């Protein structure tokens, strides 16, 4: 066959494409269970971290997550557990950020007087700006933060050094993401209050 012909070019392109698509499909099939297991562990880790439990190893995540109970309250799926002898709840959320959906977990005490943690699972925010919501310093602000008047406030400026006042430092340069997080967190607090019968 003439290597300069259109027929050869089309057949060669088809054969190479077929081989690479086949290899890609086989790789996908071989790793689908691993990917699903890793996604499940990441989700469970996020729930545990939002409840105030710090876990890192996958085996530890699976072990600790066995103590978490999935509870249905008013059609919502909540996760209930005990941390240091106190009942805590966590709820997955999805809300609109600047560029897309922010998916995370918010944890609260049973009496809704304070948050126990925040964990961001996925987002589409700008790397280096709004994407900083996944950084430890941002998420740790919600560990033990008081919830005065059923609201959290994301602030800008010099920083919030008064821990436990219901104010969270926003991210400099990511005003829209910070505003979105305030809306999402307060919406979730309202939802949790309705589900758990808070005042």
Predicted regions and their residues:
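Flexible, solvent-exposed loop/hinge segments and secondary-structure transition points
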Residues: 2-199
